[in-house]
Amino acid sequence: VPFTRRNIKADLEDVGSNFDGAPDLEFRLATKALELEQSGLGYQRIPPGYRFPYGHTHEKQEEVYVVLRGGGRMKLDEEIVELGEWDVVRVSPGTWRGYEAGPEGLEILVIGAPNLGEDPRGDVEGRRDWWAD
């Protein structure tokens, strides 16, 4: 079959509870469900005022973040970037990143390439309390 169709909300498991912190964090990974070969795709709904408790960087993967609803901020290395609805941010491999939702929450699609295969954790380094005020 030359295509795969899935519904992010209905077909993909919410793995948000695997992360520390906010009970209302929603995180759905579409890469395997869509049988993606060259890229990865994820969806996140972050509750108002929540900041991820860690930052992360990738050795090989470039990521694109698309703000679907709400707003917030991203920290990219040492720079803070404001996010609004329909903003798109490309993040190069090797760049540290973290994000927090504004008062309306933050809904984002995350697209990454190349696809990291069966063990995506081999490409990522995370650091707890990376973004401290």
PLM segments and residue spans:
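A short, N-terminal "cap"/entry segment at the start of jelly-roll beta-barrel domains
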Residues: 1-39, 47-48, 54, 121-133
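Double-stranded beta-helix
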Residues: 3, 98-133
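Short, charged/polar surface micro-motifs in flexible loops or helix N-caps
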Residues: 36-39, 47-52, 71-73, 80, ...
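Residue-level recognition of conserved beta-strand positions in structured domain cores
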Residues: 43, 76-78, 93, 101, ...
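Short, conserved beta-strand element in jelly-roll/cupin
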Residues: 43-47, 57-75
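Short beta-strand His + acidic residue motifs that chelate non-heme Fe in jelly-roll/DSBH
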Residues: 54, 74-75, 91, 97-103
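A generic "binding-loop/recognition-motif" signal
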Residues: 60, 79, 95, 104-105
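Short acidic-glycine-tyrosine-enriched beta hairpin
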Residues: 78-94
